[in-house]
A protein has these predicted regions:
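Acidic, proline/glycine-enriched N-terminal capping motif
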Residues: 1-97, 105
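Internal amphipathic helical hairpin motif
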Residues: 72-106, 161-189
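Short, charge-rich binding segments
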Residues: 58, 80, 88-90, 98-105, ...
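Conserved, structured C-terminal
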Residues: 1-25, 29-40, 112-374
Length: 374
C-alpha cells in the first residue's frame, strides 16, 4: 500500500475553528471531508482508541457542516427530505434523518436538530448535500431560506466526558437526555450542547456558533480536563465498527437503501406526508432487499492494515459481496469487519473468503453490533 508522506495546506480546503488547536496538541494526519481538513490521527489508531477509553477526548468534527432550513415551509421541506417522521421530533430534540434519492438510495445521512418550530439544522456527513437541499427546495417551490450557518461541532468523548461537561457547563448536563440539546452562552461563547456523538461511548457534541472562538472553547475544555486524563482524538474506526456505526461513502452510498444496511427502522411508510423515495422504498419493503450489511470476524493475529478500497467477498470462488471496513478490536480481542453480501448469503455463521490484495482471508459472518451503547 502507498503511504501519504505529507499534506499540503492551501486556501482551496477550509480549516475548522479548532485547526490551530489540533496542531498544538499533536495531530499527525488529516483527510479531506466536506471540503475541509479533518484530523484522522494523533498517536495512532489503537493509541487514540485506548486514550479515549481511559479518560476524555476532544474531537474536532467541524467538518460536520450544517444545512439550516428556516422559514414558513421549513418543517414541510425537512419532512420531504427524509423517510423519518420528523413530526415526532420536538424543539430541543435531535434525530438521525438520512436524505434519500428518488430510488431510495442514500444522498447523505445527517443528524437533524429542531432548533425552532420553523428552523432545522442537518449535521452532514461527507458530500455536497447543501446543493441537493437547495435544488429540491427550488424545484418544489418551498418557501424557505437555506444556508450553511456559522456552526462547527466539537465532540467530547469517553467515560469521563460527563464529568468534564458538568465541571465546565454545570449540573444541568446531568439531566440532558439522549439526542436532546440545549442552546447556551458560556463565557460569551454561543453554543448548542447535545447528548450525542459518533460512537457508542458516553459522548456529547458542542455546536460552536462563532468560528472565531474555536481555540478559546478548546482551551476551556482542555484546562478543565487535565485531571480527567484528557487527550485529543478523532472519529475512530475501531469504535465505529465495535458499535455498528455506519460511515457514509465507506459503508453505503446512493447504490444502497436503508433496508440493506439495517436502517429499515427509520423508514415510516405509514405517515401521511410524502417524502423523496417513498414509493421506491414501499416496493423494496414489499419485495425485500437484494443485499445486506453484516459483521464478519477473522481469526488469527491482529490485522494492522486498513483497506483503501472495498475488497471482494467470495464463496466457492464466486463474488457475493464486498468488505467495506476492517480493523482489530483490542477490547474484543478479534479482527472485525463490515461486509455487504447478496441476500441469500447473509445468514449469521456463514463462512466467507475476503480477497485482499495480498492474500485470501477466511472469515465468518455475525450480526451487528458487537457492543451496545453506553
Amino acid at each position: 500500500m502507498y503511504k501519504t508522506s505529507r499534506v499540503v495546506f492551501s486556501p482551496r480546503v477550509r480549516k475548522s475553528p479548532y485547526f490551530n488547536s489540533t496542531l498544538k496538541y499533536g495531530v499527525q494526519a488529516f483527510s479531506v471531508y466536506n471540503h475541509m481538513y479533518m484530523p484522522t490521527s494523533y498517536e495512532g489508531t489503537v493509541e487514540d482508541y485506548q486514550n479515549l477509553l481511559n479518560g476524555v477526548q476532544l474531537w474536532d468534527v467541524g467538518v460536520e457542516r450544517q444545512v439550516q432550513i428556516k422559514g414558513r415551509d421549513a418543517e414541510a421541506l425537512s419532512q420531504f427530505l427524509t423517510p423519518r417522521n420528523i413530526k415526532k421530533c420536538s424543539k430541543g430534540q435531535a434525530m438521525y434523518a438520512p436524505f434519500l434519492d428518488f430510488k431510495g438510495g442514500f444522498i447523505n445521512d445527517p443528524v437533524m436538530l429542531k432548533i425552532e418550530e420553523d428552523c432545522y439544522w442537518f449535521s452532514l456527513a461527507d458530500g455536497d448535500a447543501l446543493l441537493w437541499v437547495q435544488g429540491i427546495a427550488a424545484g418544489y417551490k418551498f418557501d424557505v431560506d437555506i444556508r450553511e450557518p456559522d456552526v462547527s461541532p466539537l465532540q467530547v468523548q469517553g467515560p469521563n466526558s460527563k464529568e468534564l461537561m458538568v465541571k465546565v457547563f454545570g449540573d444541568w448536563i446531568n439531566d440532558l437526555g439522549f439526542y436532546r440539546f440545549k442552546e447556551v452562552t458560556h463565557k460569551s461563547i454561543p453554543i448548542v450542547i447535545g447528548r450525542m456523538g459518533y460512537s457508542r461511548e458516553l459522548c456529547y457534541e458542542i455546536f460552536l456558533q462563532d468560528h472565531s472562538k474555536g481555540d478559546e472553547l478548546w482551551e476551556i475544555l482542555w484546562e478543565a480536563g487535565k485531571d480527567l486524563n484528557i487527550s485529543a482524538g478523532t472519529p475512530n474506526i475501531i469504535l465505529r465498527l465495535e458499535g455498528g456505526i455506519l460511515s457514509y461513502l465507506a459503508d453505503m452510498d446512493r447504490t444502497n437503501n436503508p433496508y440493506e444496511v439495517g436502517l429499515e427502522w427509520m423508514v415510516d411508510l405509514e405517515q401521511e406526508d410524502d417524502f423523496i423515495g417513498k414509493e421506491a422504498l414501499r416496493e423494496i419493503s414489499h419485495s425485500g432487499p437484494t443485499k445486506k450489511l453484516m459483521g464478519a470476524e477473522i481469526a488469527g493475529e491482529p490485522i494492522t492494515v486498513f483497506n483503501e478500497e472495498h475488497w471482494p467477498v467470495l464463496i466457492d470462488n464466486k463474488t457475493i459481496g464486498s468488505m467495506n471496513a476492517l480493523v482489530y478490536s483490542p477490547r474484543l480481542d478479534k479482527n472485525i469487519a463490515y461486509v455487504i453480501l447478496d441476500i441469500k448469503h447473509s445468514k449469521s455463521g456463514q463462512e466467507i473468503v475476503i480477497s485482499s490484495p495480498e492474500k485470501e482471508i477466511l472469515a465468518v459472518t455475525v450480526d451487528l453490533p458487537w457492543l451496545e451503547r453506553v
